[in-house]
């Protein structure tokens, strides 16, 4: 009986100590864990700057994605796009990715609207922050959270030699009829493996080296429409949908640069 009482007392003491230890620890919810990377990113990229919460920065993404490798993602910003007042850049962060900085899109008044639709990668459930910078220096931010996983690592897809040979091929099309002096929408499909450097190559049992598009430039009749600095967070075979203003028929041209020195060009006559 005495031994049983001693065991009971020890259990009570251990339980009490455990409860006290838990009470002494700061609460760490899932939401707080997801927010932690963004706090660090703000210090790295926007130290000393004010980011204004902006509901007019619209983000479209699924709450849950079937695959983290190809997650549809779009933003559209309700803001003037005139020579005096426009959104000059939009930065996309996937906070939980190995490389959170996914892309920086640079816009001009000829973009017509600061918007983009594409596909991005998620290594794990993560908030996505979209930061828009106006030409007056003001910064606007909005966010969504997406549940997805496995988009950056895993096994490298397909035949590496075939993927390298096809890299840089492009197709462009206009969404709908040409509208003179109005916002037109273009669709650009790029063949490129967009290797992250974190994918296992089954043939070598090592990691397939990173190989990705790092710069995209779009012009209309030789004038800048938009450009993008991209990284491994953009999905394989990138798809980009964007707008541009065209006052008269001309050529829409795209130039790509990848991290291995490759340069690729594609043009499309519009309105002819």
Can you describe what each PLM-predicted range is?
Residues 26-53:
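C-terminal segment of N-terminal export signals and the immediately downstream linker at the start
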């Amino acid at each position: 009986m005495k031994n049983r009482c001693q065991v009971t007392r020890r259990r009570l003491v251990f339980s009490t100590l455990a409860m006290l230890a838990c009470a002494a620890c700061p609460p760490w919810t899932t939401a707080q864990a997801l927010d932690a990377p963004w706090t660090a990113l703000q210090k790295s990229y926007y130290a000393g700057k004010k980011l204004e919460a902006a509901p007019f920065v619209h983000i479209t993404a699924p709450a849950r994605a079937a695959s983290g490798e190809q997650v549809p993602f779009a933003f559209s910003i309700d803001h003037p796009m005139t020579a005096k007042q426009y959104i000059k850049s939009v930065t996309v962060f996937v906070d939980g990715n190995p490389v959170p900085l996914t892309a920086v899109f640079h816009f001009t008044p000829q973009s017509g609207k600061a918007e983009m639709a594409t596909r991005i990668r998620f290594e794990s459930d993560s908030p996505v922050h979209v930061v828009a910078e106006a030409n007056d220096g003001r910064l606007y931010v909005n966010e969504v959270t997406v549940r997805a996983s496995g988009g950056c690592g895993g096994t490298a897809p397909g035949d590496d030699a075939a993927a390298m040979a096809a890299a840089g091929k492009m197709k462009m099309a206009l969404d709908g009829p040409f509208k003179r002096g109005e916002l037109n929408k273009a669709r650009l499909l790029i063949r490129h493996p967009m290797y992250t450097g974190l994918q296992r190559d089954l043939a070598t049992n090592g990691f397939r080296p990173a190989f990705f598009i790092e710069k995209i430039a779009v012009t209309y009749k030789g004038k800048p429409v938009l450009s993008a600095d991209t990284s491994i967070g953009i999905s394989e075979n990138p798809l980009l949908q964007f707008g541009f203003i065209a006052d008269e028929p001309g050529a829409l041209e795209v130039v790509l640069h990848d991290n291995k020195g490759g340069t690729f060009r594609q043009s499309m006559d519009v309105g002819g």
